[in-house]
């Protein structure tokens, strides 16, 4: 069996419990086709770089999968049909990462954004304050 990293984006207007239900549905599909689901990272609700089907935010979920190609094809087929899934991508990898993904490591334990993003937001606020202080 091959190793895959699979990420999907779910609509912003569904409940977090529905995201977990989608995840368990796709896990059962993978296991029914003889595959195994490894690490699962739920990155939560995050902003999108651009609007996708009128959504500005989405729930991001990353899954490590050890499964045959038929299982991946079936999961992708079902995601294509499901209206709650905005985008998905599957990448074949040589080995799964042991530590957290780069995106997940930027989140702290409470689910807050990382320091780099916080710094950029504070500098943006300072620039906006300076602009507002200028009289025309």
UniProtKB/Swiss-Prot annotation:
Family membership noted in the UniProt record: Belongs to the bacterial ribosomal protein bS6 family.
Task of the protein: Binds together with bS18 to 16S ribosomal RNA.
Query: Which keywords does this Swiss-Prot/TrEMBL entry list?
Result: Ribonucleoprotein, Ribosomal protein, RNA-binding, rRNA-binding
GO molecular function (one): small ribosomal subunit rRNA binding
> Is this entry keyworded RNA-binding?
yes
Q: Which GO biological process categories is it annotated with? A: translation
Q: Residue ranges under compositional bias (Basic and acidic residues)?
A: 117-130
Protein name (Swiss-Prot/TrEMBL): Small ribosomal subunit protein bS6
Nucleotide-binding keyword on record: no
Q: Positions of the region Disordered?
A: 117-136
Pfam families, alphabetically?
Ribosomal_S6
Taken from the UniProt record, the cysteine pairs bridged by disulfide bonds within this chain are none
Give a GO cellular-component term.
cytosolic small ribosomal subunit
Top-rank taxon: Bacteria
Biological source species: Bartonella quintana (strain Toulouse)
